């Protein structure tokens, strides 16, 4: 029976209060109640009796504008925000306890990392003092490495200077790292204690907040939010004042300090635009023919729009991939495991430094303690590697892939911001040329990514705390984690990611998906169906009837994409660069059966297949001494047999090392990859000698690390190192340096002996983000030493016998010069001298991978053929005649032809006719430039923008009011996000997170104030240079570099736009993850809240001292 059909019991009455809410009066007991007395017969008495969403007797669901849905228990006259029907609160408490265990493990691992770093710092300080004493007192002989010195090579002046500079840099770096680690440890420990207190508070007596308590917590959070917003504004003001103060100091442009004056991609992209694109004041300001300028505008705009659309699609794909990864692994679960791997890496560094230290002035007890510590470290590292699980490696692979996707997302958002700026500039220019309409149409039609996040950069929201900030690991930590992952799964590369400076897996290099590359080629260099008519029917700037403008741009050709191919992918069936040297037999063979065509690469001047000069390599198949001359094997064999005899003639092979190099323009880092060492027998090794590689970038500056050593390995036919080292330097300074690579061993008396080496010029290092790896021959110092002894003995014998015997090296050089002259004459007879000119450096030095002379000549012919083809085409284009209307201005005819895209070139045709329109250009009489009759030409905003690609269906009459041809964005009704179940534990976590955020912001503001005081004090003292502490700290460099960008108006808009897009992308990833995840949204949200307290966001360091 329905409750309303039942009569009220005797003595009961129904009434309403002032708010209209129904209550009941019991006249018998003279009491009032919110509970209908008839509910005793219709509602379940307990929760166990409830079916579906029913509430038992005495419970009521209500709504508060501030708190939301809450529940009233009329039986106990209490309120609560948790739904009594859901056991979510109990599940939250269990999850919190589990997370506390993981957080404690991560905290212990990080404390151990701090202790290991402290040991490394003490060891580095001792080593620095020892090297300083050696330098001051000039201990040991300073014989040259080239002369074959062994134990005294430790005191080579250049190497010793590099040792001192590197050790000093390592001391300062370890000090800064310990400061950061101490801050991070303090943050994590405070967060762990906060979570522990919350767990204790909420689990004790099952604490639950009532309505008034929840309202008080929300009011406090609102107050904290206002304080955070004002603090962000103060932080921006401090950054602005810091930028103004910094401008008053001098910056050394020749050192690594040129990081301060960096140009962003927006500036470079704006400079790449024609001056005509930037001048939009009047039509009369445009030089040349109006139709030519307008056509160039149109072609450039179409090209930028296609790139813009492609970048938007790429961002959408990255968001989906990030959402999938985040849904598989919840935040914070990998922290303890990652810290354990970093601890292993730190112990390896400590072990390496212990092995390479020179304990000459140490006591016997200190030396014994050092040896015992080394043995203990070796045992710990071996045990840690044995216990490393496969599941851990897989999870860390996903984390590494996520970091790579985040970096790609950041770069793509910057690209979109740059393209938007260029499109807006072009759109404004075209409006001024054609219709004079107001600028800003791009923002309404193309700002979909930006308009979705138009929040202020200084506004604060508590919900923003738990959005993933999409930050990746520190570069050095990322390198360590990647190498440790690689040890677990050799050659792993996550698919669909880009190669960055933070990736160290040098065995396999990343290659972009061919399907995506082909798709990009079709979308850029092809002629889409939607481009059948781009010219407006009523525009004076139209040079021809409506047709598709064929743009000629180097960015749109196939060659441009070929230049981005990674030639180090060993999975390719046709490898371009893995062509090993075969000096004496079949020990090194080509990995490819046929020669790949290099014409497309040579057209763009790509230097991926050339090798930098090696100055210390006189071995087989290499350059001779400092001459940089290549000699093939078949030419050297007879000469070697003639010059050397006995056991020396058996040494046909030479030791080789594979070195990879890459320069990161963004971070100003030069990466050196030590990959592989081959043919060690040529170094004349002794038994039981352990080898390591010493890398030095010379000359070395005082404030940078420039000398590095790999780990020590036992002798083998092939040694795989796979280690990477970073050098902070500008590109201009790097081109003045030399990379010195030595194979060394450590003697029993702790002296360092160099067995072989090579010097590689860095003058040709390019800005490419792709790693370039090549094989380099090593000069055997022991072999040279033995050879010099042999020559001395022969000379002395000749002097005694009276027979004149020339020096071996002189004979070698004479023979080389004679053979080179013969080769040049032979090449000069087979080619036409007037047309072909030899390149200066790279094209006449083939790769050191066994390519014969004939193959080199064929590649050279391909290069010349491609260049000649382009020059012939340009000449034919310039001399072509086109029929035009007699009133048409033909002043800029050549420029108009340059904006027409030619059809695909065929490399097999050396002389190809240029693409010329065959039909006569007949202009419309209505809109001819010459005034043939009286008419009125009305240009509106629609006509000016009809030159862009229309994404609407064909025009249908009476379908809609035709006011504009511009793309209309569909109106999307904003639907509120699904309301999550909120518990008292959620409220407590939100409150503590807000307090933590505000506390951290306060600390950052205090650091900025302190830095401002230091700069102001230095300015008052009349100092012209920045304080050394600021110049040496990488974090403050990055901060002040971004500060400098915010000062300039254009850069500020560009950076803020990219930052808004990243925030919007983070929220989109958060939303997509909630949709794709198999777990409820409440579980994901609660995990993010817990992880916030143990994942610090350290933006600014504290100010530290610089003293060594």
Curated annotation (Swiss-Prot):
It comes from the Eukaryota. GO terms for cellular component: cytosol; nucleus. Residues 653-776 form the C2 domain. PROSITE patterns: C2, WW_DOMAIN_1, WW_DOMAIN_2. The keyword Transcription regulation applies. Residues 846-861 have a biased composition (Acidic residues). InterPro entries: C2_dom (IPR000008), C2_domain_sf (IPR035892), C2_WWC (IPR037771), WW_dom (IPR001202), WW_dom_sf (IPR036020), WWC/KIBRA_Hippo_Reg (IPR051105). The keyword Coiled coil applies. Residues 533-542 have a biased composition (Low complexity). SMART domains: WW. It is found in: Nucleus; Cytoplasm, Cytosol. Residues 111-247, 294-329, 360-434, 998-1065 form a coiled coil. It holds the Pfam family WW. Homodimer. Regulator of the Hippo signaling pathway, also known as the Salvador-Warts-Hippo (SWH) pathway. Belongs to the WWC family. KIBRA subfamily. This is Protein KIBRA. It comes from Xenopus tropicalis. The gene is wwc1.
């Amino acid at each position: 029976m329905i409750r309303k059909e039942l009569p009220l019991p005797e003595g009961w009455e129904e009434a309403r209060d002032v708010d209209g809410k129904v209550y009941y009066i019991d006249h018998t007991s003279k009491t009032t109640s919110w509970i209908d007395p008839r509910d005793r017969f219709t509602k379940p008495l307990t929760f166990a009796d409830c079916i579906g969403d029913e509430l038992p007797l005495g419970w009521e669901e209500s709504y508060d504008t501030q708190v939301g849905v809450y529940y009233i228990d009329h039986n106990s006259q209490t309120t609560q925000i948790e739904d009594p029907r859901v056991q979510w609160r109990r599940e939250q408490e269990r999850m919190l306890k589990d997370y506390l265990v993981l957080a404690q493990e991560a905290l212990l691992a990080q404390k151990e990392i701090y202790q290991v770093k402290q040991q490394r710092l003490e060891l580095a300080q001792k080593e620095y003092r020892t090297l300083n004493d050696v330098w001051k007192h000039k201990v040991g002989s300073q014989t040259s490495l080239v002369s074959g010195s062994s134990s005294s090579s430790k005191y080579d002046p250049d190497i010793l200077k590099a040792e001192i500079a590197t050790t000093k840099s390592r001391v300062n770096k370890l000090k800064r790292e310990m400061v950061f680690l101490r801050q991070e440890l303090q943050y994590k420990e405070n967060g762990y204690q906060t979570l522990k207190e919350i767990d204790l508070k909420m689990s004790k007596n099952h604490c639950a907040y009532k309505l008034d308590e929840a309202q008080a917590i929300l009011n406090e959070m609102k107050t904290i939010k206002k304080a955070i917003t004002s603090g962000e504004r103060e932080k921006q003001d401090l950054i602005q004042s810091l930028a103004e103060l910094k401008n008053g100091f001098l910056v050394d442009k020749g050192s690594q300090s040129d990081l301060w004056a960096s140009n962003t991609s927006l500036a470079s992209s704006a400079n790449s635009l024609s001056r005509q694109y930037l001048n939009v004041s009047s039509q009369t300001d445009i030089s040349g023919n109006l139709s030519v300028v307008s056509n160039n505008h149109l072609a450039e705009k179409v090209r930028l729009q296609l790139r813009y659309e492609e970048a938007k699609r790429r961002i959408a794909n990255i968001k989906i991939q990030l959402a999938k990864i985040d849904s598989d692994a919840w935040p914070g679960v990998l922290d303890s495991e990652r810290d354990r791997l970093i601890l292993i890496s730190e112990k390896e560094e400590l072990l390496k430094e212990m092995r390479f230290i020179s304990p000459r002035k140490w006591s016997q007890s200190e030396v014994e303690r050092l040896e015992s510590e080394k043995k203990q470290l070796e045992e710990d590292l071996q045990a840690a590697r044995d216990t490393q699980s496969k599941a851990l490696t897989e999870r860390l692979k996903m984390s590494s892939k996520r970091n790579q996707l985040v970096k790609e997302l950041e770069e793509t958002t910057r690209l979109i911001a740059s393209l938007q700026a260029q499109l807006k500039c072009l759109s404004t220019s075209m409006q001024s040329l054609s219709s004079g309409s107001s600028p800003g149409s791009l923002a309404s039609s193309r700002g979909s990514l930006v308009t979705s996040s138009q929040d202020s950069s200084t506004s604060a929201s508590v919900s923003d705390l738990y959005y993933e900030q999409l930050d990746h690991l520190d570069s050095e930590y990322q390198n360590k984690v990647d190498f440790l992952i690689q040890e677990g799964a050799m050659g792993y590369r996550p698919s669909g990611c880009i190669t960055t400076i933070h990736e160290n897996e040098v065995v396999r290099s990343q290659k972009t998906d061919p399907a995506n590359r082909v798709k990009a080629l079709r979308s850029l260099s092809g002629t889409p169906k939607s481009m059948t008519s781009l010219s407006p029917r009523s525009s004076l700037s139209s040079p021809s009837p409506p047709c598709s403008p064929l743009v000629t741009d180097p960015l749109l050709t196939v060659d441009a994409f070929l230049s981005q191919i990674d030639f180090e992918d060993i999975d390719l069936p046709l490898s371009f660069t893995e062509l090993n040297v075969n000096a004496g037999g079949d020990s090194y063979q080509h990995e490819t059966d046929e020669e790949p065509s290099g014409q497309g690469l040579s057209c763009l001047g790509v230097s991926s297949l050339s090798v930098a000069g090696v100055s210390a390599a006189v071995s087989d198949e290499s350059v001779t001494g400092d001459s940089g001359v290549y000699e093939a094997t078949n030419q050297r064999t007879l000469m070697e047999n003639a010059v050397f005899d006995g056991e020396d003639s058996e040494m046909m092979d030479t030791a080789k090392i594979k070195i990879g190099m890459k320069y990161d323009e963004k971070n100003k880092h030069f990466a050196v990859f030590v990959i592989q060492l081959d043919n060690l027998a040529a170094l004349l090794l002794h038994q039981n000698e352990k080898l390591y590689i010493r890398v030095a970038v010379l000359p070395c500056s005082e404030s940078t690390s420039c000398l590095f050593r790999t780990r020590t390995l036992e002798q083998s036919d092939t040694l795989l190192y796979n280690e990477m080292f970073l050098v902070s330097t500008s590109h201009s300074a790097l081109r003045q340096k030399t990379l010195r690579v030595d194979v060394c061993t450590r003697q029993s008396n702790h002296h360092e002996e160099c067995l072989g080496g090579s010097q590689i010029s860095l003058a040709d290092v390019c800005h490419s983000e792709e790693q370039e790896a090549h094989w380099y021959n090593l000069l055997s110092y022991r072999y040279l030493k033995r050879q010099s002894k042999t020559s001395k003995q022969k000379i002395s014998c000749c002097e005694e016998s009276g027979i004149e015997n020339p020096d071996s090296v002189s004979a070698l050089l004479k023979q080389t010069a004679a053979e080179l002259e013969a080769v040049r004459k032979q090449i000069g007879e087979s080619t036409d001298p007037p047309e072909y000119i030899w390149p200066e450096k790279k094209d006449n030095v083939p790769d050191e991978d066994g390519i014969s002379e004939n193959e080199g000549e064929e590649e050279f012919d391909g290069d010349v053929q491609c260049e000649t083809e382009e020059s012939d085409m340009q000449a034919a284009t310039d001399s072509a005649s086109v029929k035009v209307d007699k009133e048409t201005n033909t002043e800029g005819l050549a420029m108009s032809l340059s904006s027409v895209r030619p059809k695909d070139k065929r490399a097999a045709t050396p002389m190809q006719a240029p693409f010329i329109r065959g039909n006569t250009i007949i202009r419309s009489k209505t809109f001819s430039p010459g005034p043939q009759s009286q008419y009125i030409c009305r240009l509106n905003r629609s006509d000016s923008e009809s030159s862009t690609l229309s994404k609407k269906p064909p025009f249908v009459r009476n379908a809609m009011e035709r006011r504009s041809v511009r793309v209309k964005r569909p109106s999307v009704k904003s639907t509120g996000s699904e309301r999550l179940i909120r518990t008292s534990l959620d409220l407590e976590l939100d409150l503590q997170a807000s307090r933590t955020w505000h506390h951290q912001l306060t600390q950052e503001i205090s650091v900025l104030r302190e830095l401002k005081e230091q700069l102001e004090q230095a300015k008052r003292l009349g100092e012209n240079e920045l304080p050394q502490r600021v110049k040496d700290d990488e974090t403050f460099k990055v901060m002040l570099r971004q500060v400098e960008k915010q000062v300039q108006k254009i850069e500020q808009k560009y950076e803020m736009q990219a930052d808004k897009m990243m925030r919007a992308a983070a929220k989109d990833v958060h939303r997509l993850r909630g949709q794709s995840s198999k777990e409820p949204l409440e579980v994901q949200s609660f995990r993010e809240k817990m992880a916030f307290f143990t994942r610090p966001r350290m933006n600014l360091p504290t100010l530290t001292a610089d003293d060594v």
